[in-house]
Amino acid sequence: MGKIRKLDDQLSNLIAAGEVVERPASVVKELVENSIDANSTSIEIHLEEAGLSKIRIIDNGDGIAEEDCIVAFERHATSKIKDENDLFRIRTLGFRGEALPSIASVSELELITSTGDAPGTHLIIKGGDIIKQEKTASRKGTDITVQNLFFNTPARLKYMKTIHTELGNITDIVYRIAMSHPEVSLKLFHNEKKLLHTSGNGDVRQVLASIYSIQVAKKLVPIEAESLDFTIKGYVTLPEVTRASRNYMSTIVNGRYVRNFVLMKAIQQGYHTLLPVGRYPIGFLSIEMDPMLVDVNVHPAKLEVRFSKEQELLKLIEETLQAAFKKIQLIPDAGVTTKKKEKDESVQEQFKFEHAKPKEPSMPEIVLPTGMDEKQEEPQAVKQPAQLWQPPKQEWQPPQSLVREEQSWQPSTKSIIEEPIREEKSWNSNDEDFELEELEEEVQEIEEIEMNGNDLPPLYPIGQMHGTYIFAQNDKGLYMIDQHAAQERINYEYFRDKVGRVAQEVQELLVPYRIDLSLTEFLRVEEQLEELKKVGLFLEQFGHQSFIVRSHPTWFPKGQETEIIDEMMEQVVKLKKVDIKKLREEAAIMMSCKASIKANQYLTNDQIFALLEELRTTTNPYTCPHGRPILVHHSTYELEKMFKRVM
């Protein structure tokens, strides 16, 4: 007897289910798409325990005739294609004939359906086996219930995520379908609680508002273009409204939501330099084309497609977005808080002074952490870094760059600068001895550094350049310090300590701050409320998918409390599962950057001295939290070589 045998239908369906039915969201997607293909204008989705216990889809579509009910649950049985030519002209969302038998093979399924012309059909299937079939009274449409998903495949059930995660996956796919078909009214319920309701009036902007909030919808730019092969319609947000991941961009091809990286990349390219690095827009793009130009038969899940004229399509998307942005005013409203990536902000600050015209410098506005004494004039070297930056009351005078004060450092008597330069040098006749001596000095310096650990030697300020770089000296030579990076390191260590203990120091807000989220974001955050308290986010549920913040830690940078809260919330949504250690680190880095002095801000000599002294107290005074250098050293010997005082 041969070793190769044909698998029975039930086992084949179980294998197919592994590709088609990965989780409850897959079931919802397939069943809702079937309802849309059946010309439904209203679809209700009822879930229990994120679909693991029960999924029920009710539509008002065409229904299924009695004679087709059994055939519909056979593999590769479909009403949507007849021959191979139809495979290249697919207009429907489904066509493979795999979804229903795959779902029925791993669940307990009940179907009630009617075409409206005859009595309805009641069908019960368990694990792929038909248990009951009978006629029943039913309105036109289909009512299908899937219970105990994966009851006969415990290995698959074992890999399911938490209720919140699985529900988030379902809401995400329902959102995409709602955007793809705004002409269909969708209602989503979980444990009898309504989560989403779209009107079905065909206005995709209303759908976007119900998903991402009205505030985001107000910042949408309409996109529309047409070529010989493609028609593009959609909305994208103004550059001031961005997110930290591409997940907020949705691409629709002939009414089908698809995941296509090159399309998302084309949307980004359409913004060109309008977006900060690492930031992404919220966007919805619907593309209509001849079905011959797109292959949807790539994967059973039908989320991947291939285009035959991909480059032409990408070029059209890029040019359409660029043209749209040229027609509108892109200056953000004063009332809108524009979020910026802290690392991008600091990189931009480094170049602000390069092309600036000379101007009369003014004292910087320094942000103090809440709780600091704002009347204090003298800097203090200590534990609360921002005290250093309170401007003195007297009128400020521009710093005299590179002019030493009386108490400043005096050159070492060993310096060769004090001696006249001679054309002939005694060591020139013995270069080898000099190189050995120089090497010994370098080894000695390394040993001294190893003994001192991270201790930064005392630095004596001598001036400031462009309100950005501090010049200081000691007997080792000249130091150039990036003042923003220096205070960023100081603030980082201060906030890193504070973020670890938040319960004792809390400031009440006069007006609670409201945070509106999409349903997917809301569910993700709701799951982490207790963990978020550990990093200073005290959230209370407010309404359907909103939170309010009534208080915050006193050490939040003054005047930037709401921006800090928004940034931290975005980190939580991006991380999906909160890692407290990582979130504390990100929060400390973010706040240290926002609370630090910027480029083109002039400081008094006392302020500079206090900054350098406190930098010495940090555990790592050499790099900022982003890894950029804080100071650069030029030895006296290197300077003398530059000026040809030694050869």
From Swiss-Prot:
<dbReference type="InterPro" id="IPR014790">
    <property type="entry name" value="MutL_C"/>
</dbReference>
<dbReference type="InterPro" id="IPR014762">
    <property type="entry name" value="DNA_mismatch_repair_CS"/>
</dbReference>
<dbReference type="InterPro" id="IPR036890">
    <property type="entry name" value="HATPase_C_sf"/>
</dbReference>
<dbReference type="InterPro" id="IPR014721">
    <property type="entry name" value="Ribsml_uS5_D2-typ_fold_subgr"/>
</dbReference>
<protein>
    <recommendedName>
        <fullName>DNA mismatch repair protein MutL</fullName>
    </recommendedName>
</protein>
<dbReference type="GO" id="GO:0140664">
    <property type="term" value="F:ATP-dependent DNA damage sensor activity"/>
</dbReference>
<dbReference type="Pfam" id="PF01119">
    <property type="entry name" value="DNA_mis_repair"/>
</dbReference>
<dbReference type="GO" id="GO:0006298">
    <property type="term" value="P:mismatch repair"/>
</dbReference>
<comment type="function">
    <text>This protein is involved in the repair of mismatches in DNA. It is required for dam-dependent methyl-directed DNA mismatch repair. May act as a 'molecular matchmaker', a protein that promotes the formation of a stable complex between two or more DNA-binding proteins in an ATP-dependent manner without itself being part of a final effector complex.</text>
</comment>
<dbReference type="InterPro" id="IPR013507">
    <property type="entry name" value="DNA_mismatch_S5_2-like"/>
</dbReference>
<comment type="similarity">
    <text>Belongs to the DNA mismatch repair MutL/HexB family.</text>
</comment>
<dbReference type="InterPro" id="IPR042121">
    <property type="entry name" value="MutL_C_regsub"/>
</dbReference>
<dbReference type="Pfam" id="PF13589">
    <property type="entry name" value="HATPase_c_3"/>
</dbReference>
<dbReference type="InterPro" id="IPR037198">
    <property type="entry name" value="MutL_C_sf"/>
</dbReference>
<dbReference type="InterPro" id="IPR002099">
    <property type="entry name" value="MutL/Mlh/PMS"/>
</dbReference>
<dbReference type="GO" id="GO:0032300">
    <property type="term" value="C:mismatch repair complex"/>
</dbReference>
<dbReference type="InterPro" id="IPR038973">
    <property type="entry name" value="MutL/Mlh/Pms-like"/>
</dbReference>
<dbReference type="Pfam" id="PF08676">
    <property type="entry name" value="MutL_C"/>
</dbReference>
<keyword id="KW-0234">DNA repair</keyword>
<keyword id="KW-0227">DNA damage</keyword>
<dbReference type="InterPro" id="IPR042120">
    <property type="entry name" value="MutL_C_dimsub"/>
</dbReference>
<dbReference type="GO" id="GO:0030983">
    <property type="term" value="F:mismatched DNA binding"/>
</dbReference>
<dbReference type="InterPro" id="IPR020667">
    <property type="entry name" value="DNA_mismatch_repair_MutL"/>
</dbReference>
<dbReference type="GO" id="GO:0005524">
    <property type="term" value="F:ATP binding"/>
</dbReference>
<dbReference type="InterPro" id="IPR020568">
    <property type="entry name" value="Ribosomal_Su5_D2-typ_SF"/>
</dbReference>
<dbReference type="GO" id="GO:0016887">
    <property type="term" value="F:ATP hydrolysis activity"/>
</dbReference>
